[in-house]
């Protein structure tokens, strides 16, 4: 029996714009394989929910090497986290229960205030919700939440958050209500939390906040000063964040580095480039077919179709099932991988099991067969994706003959050094014009340039030291400045002028299903994957490492 909530969500989703976003491709090995079968519910959520009985260590087979824990406060913080893990999981459930869908606006304003409340509870002296106004590409931005916490420490760390999520596009596929935060069993884990935003990115961010609150509870202060900035437009190409950062660089004065959430596969900090566009074909611009509105579908017998023209146009942009971009000059500016980078990718590929990775991602198979090719494509590949397409009769079931007058498709285009978004748009426009599609409109929704990562920095060393102490088999760093990139996020706003600080991320913990049905975050770990308690402890240790206190 479908809940009324899911029916409401389904109705809203039909009207939503389905804009794609970034998530790291989980292709490296982990203990998890995402089961798409319904999980067995083991705990309910809500204010009157009973104690969840979380086992902090779960079934994780690896543990912290306490000989590498030098600061006497850290064992106390670890014990506090274990003792309060039920409460910490409930904190995440409450956050999941507050929708924050940036593409529809559902719950965005409430979520911004909720995040400000988290920063207030942390004791930050300055917290504020900013309205960035109209973004560069003409859309209304969502709020940015800023906090500054002066702990009297020597170093200051910027922490990046995003509080927005993707819409629920396939409600019937969810085994639990997407905004309930239910805890279920999902092999090999005894407890995972199901919910929109569970892994992307409320789960790891709540682990960070729980860790910060635990440090405050045990020691009364944090080992570093913090500047925390949370955006509500990550799933909309960071449009408001871009406006905010460019308008207020002074708010980051004195920052030494940035720490971002992440998983235990490796140290991250770089970002691929991502251009998001809409392509529109209309009878009015074309001069053929319906001009002012849709008309009866029977008229196709004698009237041209903008929809068919659009489909033909799309077929000229890519070949090989969409895996090869045909736009002239598209690949021209790509900087080849170095010998060291190729060697590291080959090393990482040895740990990869394609079948297991495909199952974890929820796909039948990857484009390539060889692990080294899959790893290389996922970390330094380019793509021209079809995120969605709509026109005419979009009503589920039934019939109804319509000849649409307009058709629009959405595309995220992933790019790497030294490609640029504006250059891609310029080449696309020239190619469409050459092929006779001068009437096709290109609308730039957003553009996030790529950013490389420096590994020889204090913050990167702090994360690496934590991974070693936690016995995490992570991907080893490459040479100092590497072109091996992560999924897109607005790293470029901090890696370049005027802020220009080193960036690194990575923490224990795991999850899956970002942007998908049954998105989950691991609560009790298994095998070589830590659960939420381990994730929180790793955050605490990284901050102490960065402060030079461990």
Predicted ranges, named:
Residues 2-29:
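Gram-negative bacterial Sec-dependent N-terminal signal peptides
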Residues 192-272, 276:
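Acidic/histidine-rich catalytic neighborhood of metal-dependent amide-processing enzymes
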Residues 39-107, 125, 271:
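N-terminal hydrophobic or amphipathic helices/low-complexity stretches enriched
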Residues 163-166, 229-238, 261-265, 285, ...:
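Acidic, glycine-rich active-site loops and adjacent beta-strand->loop/helix elements
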Residues 280-354:
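Polar, glycine-rich mid-to-C-terminal structural blocks
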């Amino acid at each position: 029996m479908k809940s009324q909530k899911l029916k409401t969500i389904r109705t809203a989703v039909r009207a939503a714009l389905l804009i794609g976003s970034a998530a790291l491709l989980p292709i490296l090995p982990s203990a998890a394989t995402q089961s798409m079968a319904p999980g067995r519910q083991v705990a309910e959520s809500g204010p009157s929910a009973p104690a969840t009985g979380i086992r902090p260590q779960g079934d994780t087979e690896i543990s912290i090497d306490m000989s590498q824990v030098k600061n006497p406060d850290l064992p106390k913080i670890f014990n506090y986290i274990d003792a309060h893990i039920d409460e910490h999981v409930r904190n995440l459930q409450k956050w999941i229960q507050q929708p924050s869908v940036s593409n529809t606006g559902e719950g965005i304003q409430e979520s911004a205030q909720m995040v400000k409340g988290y920063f207030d509870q942390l004791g930050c002296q300055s917290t504020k919700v900013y309205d960035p106004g109209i973004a560069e590409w003409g859309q209304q931005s969502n709020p940015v939440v800023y906090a500054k916490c002066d702990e009297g420490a020597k170093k200051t760390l910027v922490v990046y958050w995003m509080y927005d999520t993707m819409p629920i596009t396939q409600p019937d596929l969810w085994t639990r209500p997407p905004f309930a935060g239910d805890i279920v069993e999902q092999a090999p884990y005894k407890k995972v939390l199901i919910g929109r935003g569970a892994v992307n990115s409320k789960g790891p961010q709540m682990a960070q906040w729980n860790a910060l609150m635990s440090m405050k509870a045990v020691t009364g202060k944090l080992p570093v000063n913090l500047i925390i900035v949370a955006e509500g437009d990550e799933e909309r190409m960071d449009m408001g964040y871009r406006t905010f950062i460019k308008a207020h660089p002074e708010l980051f004065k004195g920052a030494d580095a940035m720490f971002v959430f992440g998983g235990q596969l490796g140290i991250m900090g770089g970002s691929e480039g991502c251009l998001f566009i809409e392509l529109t074909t209309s009878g009015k611009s074309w001069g053929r077919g319906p001009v002012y509105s849709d008309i009866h579908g029977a008229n196709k017998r004698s009237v041209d179709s903008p929809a068919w023209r659009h489909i033909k146009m799309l077929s000229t942009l890519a070949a090989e099932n969409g895996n090869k971009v045909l736009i002239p000059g598209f690949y021209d500016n790509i900087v080849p991988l170095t010998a060291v980078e190729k060697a590291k990718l080959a090393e990482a590929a040895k740990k990869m099991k394609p079948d297991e990775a495909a199952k974890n991602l929820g796909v039948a198979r990857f484009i390539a067969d060889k692990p080294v090719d899959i790893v290389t494509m996922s970390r330094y590949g380019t793509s021209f994706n079809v995120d969605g397409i709509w026109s005419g009769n979009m009503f589920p079931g039934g019939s109804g003959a319509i000849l649409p007058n307009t058709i629009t498709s959405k595309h995220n285009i992933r790019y790497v050094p030294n490609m640029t978004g504006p250059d891609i748009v310029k080449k696309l426009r020239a190619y469409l014009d050459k092929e006779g599609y001068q009437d096709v409109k290109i609308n730039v929704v957003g553009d996030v340039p790529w950013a490389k990562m420096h590994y020889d920095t204090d913050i990167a060393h702090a994360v690496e030291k934590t991974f070693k102490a936690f016995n995490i088999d992570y991907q080893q760093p490459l040479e100092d400045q590497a072109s091996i990139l992560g999924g897109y996020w607005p790293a470029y706003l901090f890696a370049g002028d005027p802020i220009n600080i080193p960036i690194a991320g990575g923490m224990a913990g795991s999850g899956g299903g970002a942007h998908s049905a049954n998105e989950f975050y691991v609560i009790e770990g298994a095998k070589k994957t830590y659960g939420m308690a381990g994730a929180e402890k790793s955050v605490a240790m990284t901050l102490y490492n960065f402060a030079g206190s461990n």
